[in-house]
Amino acid sequence: MTTRNPNQPVSYPIFTVRWIAVHTLAVPSVFFLGAIAAMQFIHR
């Protein structure tokens, strides 16, 4: 049992760190893009 089975991620154990790094960049950028797109339609 020395082969890499898919139940044990040995190749990438820092998957959660990459997930946090992606979402700390993706969530604010999507929020600001939505806010800027919404501001295009607001004419006071």
Swiss-Prot record:
<comment type="function">
    <text>This b-type cytochrome is tightly associated with the reaction center of photosystem II (PSII). PSII is a light-driven water:plastoquinone oxidoreductase that uses light energy to abstract electrons from H(2)O, generating O(2) and a proton gradient subsequently used for ATP formation. It consists of a core antenna complex that captures photons, and an electron transfer chain that converts photonic excitation into a charge separation.</text>
</comment>
<dbReference type="GO" id="GO:0009767">
    <property type="term" value="P:photosynthetic electron transport chain"/>
</dbReference>
<keyword id="KW-0793">Thylakoid</keyword>
<keyword id="KW-0408">Iron</keyword>
<dbReference type="Pfam" id="PF00283">
    <property type="entry name" value="Cytochrom_B559"/>
</dbReference>
<feature type="binding site" description="axial binding residue">
    <location>
        <position position="23"/>
    </location>
    <ligand>
        <name>heme</name>
    </ligand>
</feature>
<dbReference type="InterPro" id="IPR006241">
    <property type="entry name" value="PSII_cyt_b559_bsu"/>
</dbReference>
<comment type="subunit">
    <text>Heterodimer of an alpha subunit and a beta subunit. PSII is composed of 1 copy each of membrane proteins PsbA, PsbB, PsbC, PsbD, PsbE, PsbF, PsbH, PsbI, PsbJ, PsbK, PsbL, PsbM, PsbT, PsbX, PsbY, PsbZ, Psb30/Ycf12, peripheral proteins PsbO, CyanoQ (PsbQ), PsbU, PsbV and a large number of cofactors. It forms dimeric complexes.</text>
</comment>
<keyword id="KW-0349">Heme</keyword>
<dbReference type="GO" id="GO:0020037">
    <property type="term" value="F:heme binding"/>
</dbReference>
<dbReference type="InterPro" id="IPR006216">
    <property type="entry name" value="PSII_cyt_b559_CS"/>
</dbReference>
<keyword id="KW-0812">Transmembrane</keyword>
<dbReference type="GO" id="GO:0005506">
    <property type="term" value="F:iron ion binding"/>
</dbReference>
<dbReference type="GO" id="GO:0031676">
    <property type="term" value="C:plasma membrane-derived thylakoid membrane"/>
</dbReference>
<dbReference type="GO" id="GO:0009539">
    <property type="term" value="C:photosystem II reaction center"/>
</dbReference>
<dbReference type="GO" id="GO:0009055">
    <property type="term" value="F:electron transfer activity"/>
</dbReference>
<keyword id="KW-0479">Metal-binding</keyword>
<keyword id="KW-0249">Electron transport</keyword>
<keyword id="KW-0602">Photosynthesis</keyword>
<keyword id="KW-0472">Membrane</keyword>
<dbReference type="InterPro" id="IPR013081">
    <property type="entry name" value="PSII_cyt_b559_N"/>
</dbReference>
<protein>
    <recommendedName>
        <fullName>Cytochrome b559 subunit beta</fullName>
    </recommendedName>
</protein>
<feature type="transmembrane region" description="Helical">
    <location>
        <begin position="19"/>
        <end position="35"/>
    </location>
</feature>
<keyword id="KW-0813">Transport</keyword>
<keyword id="KW-1133">Transmembrane helix</keyword>
<keyword id="KW-0604">Photosystem II</keyword>
<comment type="similarity">
    <text>Belongs to the PsbE/PsbF family.</text>
</comment>
